[in-house]
Amino acid sequence: MGRAEMVVGPSAAAAAYHLKNEAISWWEEVNRSRAWQDRLFHVLAILYGIVSAVALVQLIRIQMRVPEYGWTTQKVFHFLNFLVNGVRSLVFAFRRDVQKLHPEIVQHILLDMPSLAFFTTYALLVLFWAEIYYQARAVSTDGLRPSFFTINGVVYVIQIILWLIIWWKPVRVLVILSKMFFAGVSLFAALGFLLYGGRLFLMLQRFPVESKGRRKKLQEVGYVTTICFSCFLIRCVMMCFNAFNKAADLDVLDHPILNLIYYLLVEILPSSLVLFILRKLPPKRGITQYHPIR
């Protein structure tokens, strides 16, 4: 038995080594292939287009259901999803043309601005949950919306300043700083979901078992918290690699597989799942937690 294992062992190791080399070779071949680059970027464009269309359809359904209400949190959330995914779809549909734009800062803006808008879109969910949580505990929510706008304003201002500095002096250190800043923003968003999603989940658990909709709302909050926390945490880690490792650079044409995996994990799948989970339309009458944005 021992001798047989000694014979099989090296053979299995050699086969694994061969498979590894083949996988690396295939990865490099796809990355170098102009045709494969275009195919994978167009796949991303189509997927983003589908998510954008779904968000728009849901926005129209909500408007038809409650036309008497203005821009509610739910409507703004779906509109921003439509906008972010629609812009991403156009960017990837014309990805090769985007790479030719000059000055180079225009490329950074087109590739990074949707990420900032994605942060704002899902920060809106954190705001909504924070309002529900504090209202349920009879705590004033007057400072939440100003805080939301202030945080987003600071994030956008800092990013715009970084873009202007990069435009003025395009050095590698500033690009790294910009990517690390966004990694920090992503970590902040992940912690926001963990804090308020977790608080709301624990609060719902304390409701009486017979409470109407308790089980469904628990699942909704639990799933969305897990999905959004994971996607922003993955984005944070990936942006750190992206900043310091050229092999993980997402802003180039010759990393199409990495782009496909990254954007699937941090934007397309999370957006699709969250839109599916939050697909329920608001009630027509007797609305208690459906507030217009003021």
Curated annotation (Swiss-Prot):
Single GO BP term: viral replication complex formation and maintenance
Membrane-traversing stretches: 40-60, 76-94, 109-129, 148-168, 173-193, 221-241, 257-277
GO CC field: plant-type vacuole membrane
Topology, Cytoplasmic side: 61-75, 130-147, 194-220, 278-294
Extracellular side stretches: 1-39, 95-108, 169-172, 242-256
Cell compartment(s), UniProt: Vacuole membrane
InterPro entries noted in UniProt: THH1/TOM1/TOM3 (IPR040226), THH1/TOM1/TOM3_dom (IPR009457)
Glycosylation site list: 31
Superkingdom of source: Eukaryota
Protein keywords: Glycoprotein, Membrane, Transmembrane, Transmembrane helix, Vacuole
Knockout-associated phenotype: Reduced efficiency of intracellular multiplication of tobamoviruses (e.g. TMV-L, ToMV, PMMoV, and TMGMV), characterized by a reduced accumulation of viral coat protein (CP) and reduced amplification of TMV-related RNAs.
Topology term for the membrane: Multi-pass membrane protein
Applied use: TOM3 inhibition via RNA interference constitutes a useful method for generating tobamovirus-resistant plants.
The family this protein is said to belong to: Belongs to the plant tobamovirus multiplication TOM1 protein family.
PANTHER family referenced in this protein's UniProt entry, alphabetically: THH1_TOM1_TOM3 DOMAIN-CONTAINING PROTEIN, TOBAMOVIRUS MULTIPLICATION PROTEIN 1-LIKE ISOFORM X1
Function of the molecule: Necessary for the efficient intracellular multiplication of tobamoviruses, probably being a membrane anchor promoting the formation of the replication complex.
Name of the protein in its database record: Tobamovirus multiplication protein 3
Species whose genome carries this gene: Nicotiana tabacum
